[in-house]
Amino acid sequence: MSRQSFYADPSSAGRQMKYRKDLFPLLDTREITACLLECEFNVTQELIVKPTADFVTNLFEQFLDTFMGIPLGTIRKKARKMSRINPLESDQANGKPQQSPEEDFNDNQENDKTKDTFSALQLLILHRYLAIFFSTCGINDFVLTDIARPDGYRIRRILSAVINFIRFREDQSPKFDHLANECEATADKVSEVQAENSATMQKINAIKEKLEMDSENDESNRKNLQYINSYNRKLETKLRELKVMQERLTKEHDDYKQEKALLAKKLYDINFLYNETQEQVANLTKYAETDLSILVKITEDLSNDLSSMQTNYKNLEKSYQNMGITIDSIQVNEINLKDLLKLAEDITRNVEKRQIEGKILKDNQDNLDELTRKQMELEGQILIVQNQLNKSNKKYQDLIVQADKKESAVKLKLEETKQEFNDILSEKEKHNEEHKRIMDQIVKIQQETTAIQDAFVKESKEVELKLINLMSIIKRYMSDLRNNI
């Protein structure tokens, strides 16, 4: 599951369309300013729209101080140490002996190179820390130009990711308060052990100095010195044990931090998958409500049309029977009667065809009911998947509560949860394929129904034309009959 976004040219007019969709919302400058001011960061809307390198550097250093525990000035100290710049060099410049102009020129060039190296190192170190922090926030395309030549849109996107991270941390922080308290207590214990170590070392040094002074003045203190040396060895042994304990506590604290980050990331992924499943359930419900009602209405309309056609056919058949009695007694109009019989046979075939089409419509309705039943079963399976996701969330909460237990038990529980999650994903893919197949069948039935409707309308018009011709023939025949009578 990738969360990367592609970096676009800041000067391009269509740079916003070159980013792939991020998992966090893009906020406007007003909301960004309000949120950062609420978090006690010194920002303005003008600086966010048109950021400067100094503003971005200071703001990002405050982010590192607040969220990663890197104090302000640490990056400058590391850059100064790496470039071997003496921070007091400018203050001591007046105390140097006077040099020749050529030596002064060479020194100035060397100082300029050193300062350039210091600026570049400071920028690289800041970028390294920020890349780690922004990757956690969902920004994986952070580059050096975002610090040296910041762009308004990219800074707005980065600040939106940071605010989304702050909101997520505020929502999830109550769940980890007890773990944070335990970490603070462990850190306090480590500090106490370190203070005890320092005090013990000071005592040892003081005793050594005192013993050295006493040994110079009086040789009778040798026995005491031996005793103190043995005591010192015991203290050194205890000091080594305390150092081992300190290293172990530090390692446990680092392991806890890594475990905490993994658990938080897994919780974010599960919430994201849960939201996607909710959207798919809503779409399935919408399809079920809309398509079924339309097909039922179409079927009812076709049934009503079929009933009206059958009624017309019965009336025509009755009229034909009444006219047949008169036609049998009249030999003169035999040819016209044959034409009428042929036309009546055509009408009968058309009516039988309508009945067949009605049967087909009924079969389609049965298929539609079957598809509806399968769709309802699929919705029930989706609800089961949703319940399984809820159970997974509950298990995940239990894992967070038991995070301070043995590492082996935590890993075993995480593997079980991961297996269940993979099963749910595979089951979800199967359900998606089944849903796609059902939707294809529904579309096919709709197309067949539309074709039948069109054919029915066309044949109805043809029958109406034939009925009109039949009525004209009957009227002409009746008028001829009256004239003959």
From Swiss-Prot:
Gene Ontology CC entries for this record: membrane; Ndc80 complex; nucleus
The keyword Coiled coil belongs to this UniProt entry's keyword annotation: yes
Keyword Cell division: yes
Annotated keywords: Cell cycle, Cell division, Centromere, Chromosome, Coiled coil, Kinetochore, Mitosis, Nucleus
SUPFAM superfamilies: t-snare proteins
Coiled coil feature spans: 177-449
One Gene Ontology term of the molecular function aspect: protein-containing complex binding
Compositionally biased region (Polar residues): 89-100
Protein's job: Acts as a component of the essential kinetochore-associated NDC80 complex, which is required for chromosome segregation and spindle checkpoint activity.
Subunit-level organization: Component of the NDC80 complex, which consists of NDC80, NUF2, SPC24 and SPC25.
Protein name in the entry: Probable kinetochore protein NUF2
Species in which this protein is naturally found: Candida albicans (strain SC5314 / ATCC MYA-2876)
Phylogenetic lineage: Eukaryota, Fungi, Dikarya, Ascomycota, Saccharomycotina
Gene giving rise to this polypeptide: NUF2
